[in-house]
Amino acid sequence: MHAIIETGGKQYRVAPGDVIRVEKLAGDIGSEIELPVKAAFKEGGELVSGKVTGTIVGADRAAKIIVFKFKRKKQYKKTIGHRQSFTDVKIGDVLV
């Protein structure tokens, strides 16, 4: 059984036991969360409604990216760095 969930503006195909990296979620490491389900599928490919639960197993920040802006002939240069936060979630159950 697998499901399609949506979080952080993106959709993920998940099955029980998967560990996925999603945009930062509120919650402490080890806490249980319920993820919004777009669709759930049984083994035969039948579409059913369902519920997905997961556990937060980690949180970190991605590698820094550099954003560089400039305007030619105007002596304007600007450098900015950005690190995106993410959360690792272990999928527990896909319930129908």
Curated annotation (Swiss-Prot):
Belongs to the bacterial ribosomal protein bL21 family. It holds the Pfam family Ribosomal_L21p. GO terms for cellular component: cytoplasm; ribonucleoprotein complex; ribosome. Keywords: Ribonucleoprotein, Ribosomal protein, RNA-binding, rRNA-binding. InterPro entries: bL21-like (IPR028909), bL21-like_sf (IPR036164), Ribosomal_bL21 (IPR001787), Ribosomal_bL21_CS (IPR018258). This is Large ribosomal subunit protein bL21. This protein binds to 23S rRNA in the presence of protein L20. The keyword RNA-binding applies. One of its GO terms (molecular function) is rRNA binding. Signal peptide: none annotated. GO terms for biological process: translation. The lineage of its organism: Bacteria, Pseudomonadati, Acidobacteriota, Terriglobia, Bryobacterales.
